[in-house]
Amino acid sequence: MLEIKRVEVDEFWADSTVIEAGDYVFVGYCMANEGKSIEEQINGAIDVLEVRLNMVGLTLESVVKMDCLFKDIEDLNALPAVLKERFAGKYPTRKAYTSDFIREGIRFQIDAIAYKK
């Protein structure tokens, strides 16, 4: 069995936000700019995703799947413009969900899978 490497662990919440497993990297709980506009929260989440990918030598181009969690599914309308700007045509597959978040100011979060090879 290949080694599973937990790159970033959050002891408070008892989870790993970056895991390398085989040829894949799993990145969770990318969220930022709490209380700001949906565009700022989407960009902030992508910034966090980018930082976490850089921890394992990857970029946004290596992302193959994204789960996008929205407090209000109508905010999905803001996502394409930000993705076009940030992913420059190299888009991952994605799924959008609604979620109740733990704090009122959170409107968006990303979980992602990236490919290493």
Please give the residue ranges for each predicted region.
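N-terminal presequence-like segments and the immediate start of the first folded domain
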Residues: 1-64, 70-117
